[in-house]
Amino acid sequence: MFEVVIGLEVHTQLNTKTKIFCSCATSFGEAPNTNVCPTCLALPGALPVLNEEAVKKAIAFGKAVNAAINKKSVFNRKNYFYPDLPKAYQISQFDIPIVEKGELFINVNGENKRIGITRAHLEEDAGKNIHENNFSKVDLNRAGTPLLEIVSEPELRSSDEAVAYLKKLHSIIRFLDISDANMQEGSFRCDANVSIRPKGDTKLYTRVEIKNLNSFRFIQKAIDFEVKRQSEAWEDGTYEQEVVQETRLFDTTNLVTRSMRGKEEAAEYRYFPDPDLLPVLLKDEFLQIKIPELPDEKKMRFVSELGIKESDAEVIISSLEMSRFFESLISQNLSPKLCVNWLNTELMGFLKGELTIENSPVDAQKLGDLIKRIEDGTISAKAAKDVLAFVFENTNVEIDEAIEKLGLKQVSDDSAIEAVIEQILNANADKVAEYKSGKDKLFGFFVGQTMKEGKRAFNPAKVNEILKAKLG
């Protein structure tokens, strides 16, 4: 039996307005090579100037993961040649990063586990190579975008743990608002270092790096395939020949990893301090940066103060947008439990395909108006589902207007309900006698008949109250 050893390197693009060492914009999707300047293009004499906002965002992350913030950190040149790297070196941090020795807690199968974070360092992103129609093109818009590279300890033992760690990290980054962490646009990318060893062995064996994984599903599939490949090689006696220190790519069509190139050692990059950048010396006020409430803290508050289930709170804190939507709901002085049900179950049931909580046709104010009408007895919970479906398709219609159009306003007038109940009881005298002789289950029959006659417009609570009084 084997133990899996996984360490993850996450590159997250910081959401600063300008690049890390120049004033070019970081906006995504612009025409190729328009967000560039002499610094981005590595023209002679162009000097880098560090973006203060990038430093602040790195510090905020460090505080969120209980890490040490180094008051002095150094930028280094990482030397390698690639077409999308015009300087032929990347400005990064090596031996003295801005953040180190952090931690993050995950829960897998009901068990809590601490995962160490070795370091988080600032660096610049490279440009982008585009290969099409037998041509290779280079777009340098992305070159110089600030990155925070977050390196975990090799303490993850399965693909499930790796995905749980990444989801937790992704959530923290979003709640800190230091990155949009959009995996499809490449602002949250992961490299996975995977190796195996016999259970009980503490030695670290040959690791393989899988590059640029950009979805949680592909991360899980890539790790699972690589573990299977290495395990089979060990069992077949071909481990030393087939498992070498290398960089592999994940084939998302066939769900396999493929060799890309040999894995470089740190010495091959010839790191040395960048002579154009002074060491970063942090003043005390930088270390006092306030960070917002984090997902786990929100979850605990929702459970303790609002009395909702932990499982429901987990769904709410699953994204920053979901959390904001929920807090907007409860700010309207509504029942927290009703808010949870109508957000987590009813509204989310409508959000499919391209629709997310962020672009939901029904916003928090409109859903809150619907919940108010349930609370004040204007409509029943069952009728409210029809109203939600209607306003979901007819986005310009307000809740009260939808209730009127659909004719779903509840009747709470005692005399109107009593008249229908009298009619039903008189028409079912035999069942009334059976009920009074002990067949309590017939109460549901009387409720159903009354609601049917009332065309679902009767207030169920009133129906129950009057029926109980009539039947004795």
UniProtKB/Swiss-Prot annotation:
One of its GO terms (molecular function) is glutaminyl-tRNA synthase (glutamine-hydrolyzing) activity. Its EC number is 6.3.5.-. It is an enzyme of class 6 (ligase). One of its GO terms (biological process) is translation. Disulfide bonds: none annotated. The keyword Protein biosynthesis applies. PROSITE patterns: GATB (PS01234). It holds the Pfam family GatB_Yqey. Keywords: ATP-binding, Ligase, Nucleotide-binding, Protein biosynthesis. It catalyses: L-glutamyl-tRNA(Gln) + L-glutamine + ATP + H2O = L-glutaminyl-tRNA(Gln) + L-glutamate + ADP + phosphate + H(+); L-aspartyl-tRNA(Asn) + L-glutamine + ATP + H2O = L-asparaginyl-tRNA(Asn) + L-glutamate + ADP + phosphate + 2 H(+). The keyword ATP-binding applies. Gene3D superfamilies: 1.10.10.410, GatB domain, N-terminal subdomain. Heterotrimer of A, B and C subunits. Allows the formation of correctly charged Asn-tRNA(Asn) or Gln-tRNA(Gln) through the transamidation of misacylated Asp-tRNA(Asn) or Glu-tRNA(Gln) in organisms which lack either or both of asparaginyl-tRNA or glutaminyl-tRNA synthetases. The reaction takes place in the presence of glutamine and ATP through an activated phospho-Asp-tRNA(Asn) or phospho-Glu-tRNA(Gln). Belongs to the GatB/GatE family. GatB subfamily. This is Aspartyl/glutamyl-tRNA(Asn/Gln) amidotransferase subunit B.
